């Protein structure tokens, strides 16, 4: 687990954010996660609608009111008359598809898979955000460390310059050496300024990824996260990823949906059967005549019906066959995408393991080089103070020391990220590391 050496503070504005804190904050405030969450909500609604379409009928009620002026038919005598009349009707009906080519059943299965796809896309978005935050966080740590190293170099150069100026006054150091040391100090100050600017820039990038409030300063833990446990074997990681990788599972579910849509298109060539039932009643009056009261007409004019409907597709300009052909092509595309995605995931995992192993070797070498260069730097610093080497020779040793420090930090953080990626492919979410 990617633990950190210090803990966060109590207030958010003054708290020290660890790597885990930054990833957690980014996931909970990311607009991408909000979009994915809304899409998952749509998928759940589609799932609910598909369930209702299979198990519940369609029910509707209607009513209308109208006045008739002029010639019309008397509903009592079924003869024409010219009196003004008032009509009011009420009805309720229900319908249920007994057989629709299994369209509703297939839609139910497709919606269930669609919900799984949406939830996996949400998890994939979470992983992408965590990885981006991790990389940005490591960049901030790298440039913060570089900034601190250059600040130490500036302080050391100032100390050496002051000592050289005193030695010049005593006649033990030439003016040319002092000028070279002043130039060295100016160079170190310039590099320190650049490193500090880069640190602030990468800190702003991290803040943007986290959606951190603009009016608040982001303070991260300067301690470097510890290394994860022993690396996982390549084959075990590949086997797990080919079964559980979100993008590959999404591609597999899309193949399943394409196959179901092809089956549904074929079933649409068969007749559809529906059962319908309803009840209606009416009320009417005529100007200048006596009619039955509303409650009596409401009861007496009521009627019911039951309808069995069979629809047989005969000729629809080959639209059914065209739909089948298009769904078959969609299945071929989905299968090809799945095969390509499976190959890509396998290659990505193997490359990630290879990058992790290479980063581990590079880090060990950089650590050894940094230790040697640090010892050489300390010896050269003493030699410079004693006047045994020139400032130009010391600059070369100092540059080698700075480069070794930067390489060690960079290789360590690179190994940290590569190991986290491999562990993610092995089934450990970034937030759980």
PLM regions with names:
Residues 11-58, 62, 70, 214-256, ...:
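Bacterial Sec-pathway N-terminal export signals of envelope proteins
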Residues 12, 69, 407-433:
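Acidic, low-complexity, intrinsically disordered peripheral segments
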Residues 34-38, 52, 84, 98-126, ...:
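Sec/SRP-type N-terminal targeting helices
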Residues 49, 146-167, 194-205, 350, ...:
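Extended, amphipathic, non-transmembrane alpha-helical segments
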Residues 62-96, 222-231, 263, 276-312, ...:
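Small/polar, glycine/serine/threonine/aspartate-rich low-complexity segments that form flexible
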Residues 125-242, 355, 359, 401:
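Periplasmic alpha-helical coiled-coil/stalk elements that build and connect Gram-negative outer-membrane
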Residues 168-172, 384-388, 425:
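A short glycine-centered flexible hinge/capping loop motif at secondary-structure junctions
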């Amino acid at each position: 687990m990617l633990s950190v050496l210090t803990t966060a503070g109590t207030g958010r504005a003054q708290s020290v954010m660890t790597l885990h804190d930054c990833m957690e904050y980014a996931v909970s405030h990311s607009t991408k996660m909000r979009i994915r969450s809304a899409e998952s909500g749509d998928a759940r609604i589609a799932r609910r609608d598909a369930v209702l379409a299979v198990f519940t009928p369609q029910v509707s009620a209607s009513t209308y009111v109208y006045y008739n002026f002029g010639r019309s038919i008397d509903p009592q005598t079924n003869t024409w008359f010219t009196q003004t009349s008032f009509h009011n009707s009420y009805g309720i009906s229900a319908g249920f598809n007994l057989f629709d080519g299994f369209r509703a059943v297939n839609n139910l299965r497709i919606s269930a898979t669609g919900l799984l796809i949406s939830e996996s896309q949400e998890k994939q978005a979470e992983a992408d955000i965590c990885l981006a935050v991790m990389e940005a966080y490591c960049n901030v740590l790298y440039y913060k460390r570089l900034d601190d190293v250059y600040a130490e170099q500036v302080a050391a150069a100032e100390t050496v310059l002051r000592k050289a100026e005193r030695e010049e006054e005593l006649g033990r150091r030439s003016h040319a050496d002092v000028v070279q040391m002043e130039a060295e100090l100016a160079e170190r100050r310039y590099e320190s300024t650049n490193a500090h600017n880069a640190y602030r820039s990468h800190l702003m990038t991290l803040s943007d990824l986290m959606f951190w409030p603009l009016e608040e300063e982001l303070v991260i833990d300067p301690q470097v996260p510890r290394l994860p446990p022993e690396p996982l074997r390549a084959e075990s990681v590949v086997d797990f990823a080919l079964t559980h990788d979100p993008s590959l599972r999404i591609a597999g579910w899309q193949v399943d949906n394409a196959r179901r849509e092809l089956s549904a298109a074929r079933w649409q060539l068969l007749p559809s059967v529906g059962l319908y039932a309803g009840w209606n009643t009416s009320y009417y009056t005529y100007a200048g005549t006596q009619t039955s009261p509303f409650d009596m007409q409401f009861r007496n004019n009521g009627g019911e019906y039951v309808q069995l409907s069979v629809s047989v597709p005969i000729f629809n300009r080959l639209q059914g066959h065209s739909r089948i052909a298009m769904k078959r092509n969609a299945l071929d595309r989905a299968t090809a995408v799945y095969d390509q995605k499976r190959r890509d995931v396998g290659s990505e995992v193997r490359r990630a393991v290879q990058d992790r192993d290479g980063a581990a070797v590079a880090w060990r070498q950089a650590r050894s080089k940094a230790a040697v260069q640090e010892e050489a730097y300390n010896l050269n610093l003493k030699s410079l103070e004693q006047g045994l080497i020139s400032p130009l020779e010391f600059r070369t040793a100092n540059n080698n020391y700075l480069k070794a420090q930067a390489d060690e930090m960079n290789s360590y953080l690179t190994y940290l990220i590569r190991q986290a990626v491999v562990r993610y492919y092995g089934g450990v979410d970034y937030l759980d590391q």
